[in-house]
From Swiss-Prot:
GO terms for cellular component: AMPA glutamate receptor complex; axon; dendrite; endoplasmic reticulum; endoplasmic reticulum membrane; glutamatergic synapse; postsynapse. Its main location: other. Residues 760-801 are annotated as: Required for interaction with GRIA1. This is Palmitoyl thioesterase CPT1C. Pfam families: Carn_acyltransf (PF00755), CPT_N (PF16484). The gene is Cpt1c. The lineage of its organism: Eukaryota, Metazoa, Chordata, Craniata, Vertebrata. It is a multi-pass membrane protein. Expressed in brain (at protein level). The keyword Transcription does not apply. It comes from Rattus norvegicus (Rat). Peripherally associated with AMPAR complex. AMPAR complex consists of an inner core made of 4 pore-forming GluA/GRIA proteins (GRIA1, GRIA2, GRIA3 and GRIA4) and 4 major auxiliary subunits arranged in a twofold symmetry. One of the two pairs of distinct binding sites is occupied either by CNIH2, CNIH3 or CACNG2, CACNG3. The other harbors CACNG2, CACNG3, CACNG4, CACNG8 or GSG1L. This inner core of AMPAR complex is complemented by outer core constituents binding directly to the GluA/GRIA proteins at sites distinct from the interaction sites of the inner core constituents.
Length: 801
């Protein structure tokens, strides 16, 4: 098989005595280097875990403590109050000549015990500090004296240079809300979207639930919260993602490249820099040298989702998938024009340079060999229903185990697409829509959807990222993507001719072509999967539009939360689009807690509906609408803060539902809750998490974010990102098959709603619509649309990577 890239070093010959195997020196060298890398990696992992575990202390603090104890002993003082003498008695008797050594060992043991006790005390104190969420409830943009004191203590107990996983032992566990309060909030959220008779029916079911099932379910859930790291996250991963039997196309999300700039038009060069940067990130991740994410620059978030970022594959099962995570991987799997390749990422000198990786990718692009039978569309199986793929995978594993293991064991998947993508001068609107659609679905057979993420490199040098959702949520993948774009462009850079910097390596082994010896019996399954994938892809309606009339700076000037501002705009736009209110899903993170993931903010509140109705009522004045707008913003902020502090609605009800199923309890109320449909699913894409470069100094280097598919056949998926201070980008998705939705129509309503809401803050001066769709007056900077090579002398970020 092609997996054996050192086959030329393994010489086999037959003699009369049987088979003889001669191992050449290069094989022994490779075995030695592999073992050395493994030992070094394991030692680094142990050392980094140790450093993360003792934060805020350091090994130097132990040395200082030990030296202080020794100094006290020299001064004939006993800081241990007799404990060191007890320790000496427990040590072996080595004779009088080793009395001094016994004293040193006793002092070291006492110093270690005292040091460990101090660290434990600091961890307990830090956990108590991090359990405080009162700062979340303060008015937007203000900080009271108690909060300032709390923040100062958090910084003191956090240490000077915390590592990525330093806070994991100190993070509090996610609390289980009270059942009465959760049900009350749920009924409050349902009131705006239900008729009176339907609402009365839900109230009756809720009362029965609180009286009959809630006490027992709540008790068991409390017991689980005491025993598990998080009372809901493991069930969320299993039942929402891994037990889902639908296509992964429905749950993936994507991220885009820079909007205006393409650093190089050379596909292989961009792939080389990007892959090198991603593996640099993995190196920093393994050594825990990535700083932990701090909310508002002060409160650490859980970093557990980073652990399965690389070397991870979702393996299909008949009833349930599972995530296979490897400790390390020394290659990436590459797909190009129906063919699979293995590209090694390391040599005896470590990680390959960007120029060496470019050389490997260029070889693949230049390779004229055709795809093997059944190979071209094989990846369509990963887009098939999971149970079907699980059954076919057994046959693939039997006949092409080496190739399958190579793909599933890769650090990540790389797709070298044959078409260009990105913003174009000729048709900016349509080009962005096509770009988003390609990132979300591909052609149905050119993405290995099981991998944790797929790096997509287009023929004109544009990049994109497609992410499988089960292992992590958008902010974690977004952190990786920000690092990748900033580092490969600003830190690594490109030569003046567009190639990666450095020199090719003529001695580098060529990429290995994977061989798929597949039986013809799986041809119908591949064809069926391909038809299904193309049907799913063709049914997705994607629309991306940047809005340039104003952005975050203007919203800040209105003294309201930017996220709440957009959420109310979406409520107004959706009402104009559908003529009714609906359940709205906004994703909020719960990473303030250990292994926290997300919670739902139900943005369609009574206050939001009152504001929307006022905006549609010509008899209401701007002052009245503005007052209702501020009430709706305050309500949304309260819901968002409650969700972030573990007092949300939906994850608690979800956990109660799973517990009822495990206990074989029938709850019509919980069944009704879980059957509700989210017709509007929204999310804000985080930006500037890494601070590797200042987007204000380089306004052309903004990304238009990313998006996801709709959660319902007749619903919308809407994501948004603030591009700098003066622009907002929206990604809208819906189903072509629905007669009730239209992504472009909703986009126009969002644009109108943004202008109408902004006009409320202009003291009677209306924002004038300057364009319909995307035209020259919309603020598009046509001078920046070219995909030319970036000036290699561009100023670099001051951040030391």
């Amino acid at each position: 098989m092609a997996e054996a890239h050192q086959a030329s070093s393994l010489l086999s010959s037959l003699s009369s005595d049987g088979a003889e195997v001669e191992l050449s020196s290069s094989v022994w060298q490779e075995i030695y280097l592999s073992a050395l890398r493994s030992w070094k990696r394991n030692l680094w992992r142990v050392w980094n875990d140790f450093l993360a575990g003792v934060v805020p202390a350091t090994p130097l603090s132990w040395l200082f403590l030990f030296s202080t104890i020794q100094l006290a002993c020299l001064l004939q003082l006993d800081p241990s109050l007799g404990l060191m003498e007890k320790i000496k008695e427990l040590l072996p008797d080595w004779g009088g000549q080793h009395h001094q050594l016994q004293g040193l060992l006793a002092a070291a043991v006492f110093a270690s015990c005292l040091w460990g006790t101090l660290i434990f005390t600091l961890h307990v104190a830090l956990r108590l500090l991090l359990s405080h969420h009162g700062w979340l409830l303060e008015p937007h943009g203000t900080m009271s004296s108690p909060t300032k004191t709390w923040l100062a203590l958090v910084r003191i107990f956090s240490g000077r240079h915390p590592r990525l996983f330093s806070f994991q032992r100190a993070l509090p566990r996610q609390p289980v809300p009270g059942a009465q309060e959760t049900v009350r909030k749920y009924l409050e959220s349902m009131r705006p979207v239900l008729r009176d008779d339907a609402f009365d029916s839900v109230v009756a079911l809720a009362n029965d639930f609180l009286r009959l099932q809630a006490p027992r379910l709540q008790l068991y859930l409390q017991l689980k919260s005491w025993c598990a790291s998080n009372y809901v996250s493991d069930w969320w991963e299993e039942f929402v993602y891994l037990r889902s039997r639908g296509s992964l196309v429905n749950s993936t999300y994507y991220m885009m490249d820079f909007l205006y700039v393409t650093p190089t038009p050379l596909q292989a060069a961009r792939a080389g820099n990007a892959v090198h940067t991603l593996l640099l990130y993995r190196h920093l991740l393994n050594r825990q040298e990535i700083p932990p994410t701090l909310l508002m620059g002060m409160r650490p978030l859980c970093s557990a989702q980073y652990e399965r970022m690389f070397n991870t594959t979702r393996i299909p099962g008949v009833e349930k998938d599972y995530l296979c995570h490897l400790q390390d991987s020394q290659h990436v799997a590459v797909f190009h024009q129906g063919r699979f390749f293995r590209v090694g990422t390391h040599s005896s000198n470590g990680l390959l340079s960007p120029r060496a990786l470019e050389q490997q990718f260029q070889y693949i692009l230049d390779d004229p060999s055709p795809a093997c039978p059944l190979e071209e569309h094989l990846a369509a199986l990963t887009a098939a229903p999971r149970s079907m793929w699980a059954q076919v995978r057994e046959s693939v594993k039997t006949h092409a185990a080496t190739a399958l293991e190579t793909v599933e064991g890769a650090a990540f998947f790389v797709s070298l697409d044959s078409e260009p993508a990105g913003l174009t001068r000729e048709n900016p609107a349509a080009s962005l829509d096509t770009y988003a659609h390609t990132l979300l679905t591909g052609q149905g057979h050119d993405r290995w959807f099981d991998k944790s993420f797929t790096l997509i490199v287009f023929s004109n040098g544009k990049l994109g990222l497609s992410v499988e959702h089960s292992w992590a949520d958008c902010p974690v993948a977004g952190h990786l993507w920000e690092f990748t774009l900033a580092t490969e462009c600003f830190q690594l850079g490109y030569a003046t001719d567009g190639h990666c910097k450095g020199h090719p390596d003529p001695a580098l082994p060529k990429p290995q072509r994977l061989q798929w010896d597949l039986p013809k019996q799986i041809q119908p399954s591949i064809s069926l999967a391909l038809r299904g994938a193309k049907t799913l892809s063709g049914n997705i309606d994607c629309h991306v539009f940047p809005f340039f009339h104003f952005g975050k700076s203007f919203i800040k000037g209105c003294h309201v939360s930017s996220d709440s501002f957009i959420q109310l705009v979406l409520q107004l736009a959706h009402f104009r689009d559908r003529g009714q209110f609906c359940l709205t899903y906004e994703s909020a993170m719960t990473r303030l807690f250990l292994e926290g993931r997300t919670e739902t903010v139900r943005s369609c509140t009574r206050e939001a509906c009152q504001f929307v109705r006022a905006m549609e009522n010509k008899e209401r004045t701007d002052q009245q609408c503005l007052a209702l707008f501020r009430e709706a913003v305050d309500k949304h902020q309260a819901l968002l803060k409650a969700a972030m502090s573990g007092q949300g609605i939906d994850r608690h009800l979800f956990a109660l539902y799973i517990m009822s199923r495990l206990l074989h309890m029938q709850s019509p109320f919980l069944t009704q809750v879980q059957s509700q449909q989210w017709l509007l699913s929204t999310s804000q894409i985080p930006v500037q998490q890494t601070h590797l470069f200042d987007v204000h100094n380089y306004p052309d280097y903004v990304s238009s974010g990313g998006g996801f598919g709709p959660a319902h056949d007749h619903g919308y998926g809407v994501s948004y990102i603030f591009m700098g201070e003066n622009a907002i980008s929206f990604h809208i998705s819906s189903k072509q098959s629905s007669t009730e939705t239209d992504s472009h129509r909703l986009g126009q309503h969002i644009e109108d709603a943004l202008l109408d809401v902004a006009s409320l803050f202009q003291a009677g001066q209306q924002f004038k619509r300057q364009f319909t769709g995307l035209g020259e007056s919309s603020g598009w900077k046509y001078s920046n649309l070219s995909c030319k090579t970036v000036d290699p002398n561009i100023p670099k970020s001051s951040t030391n990577l």
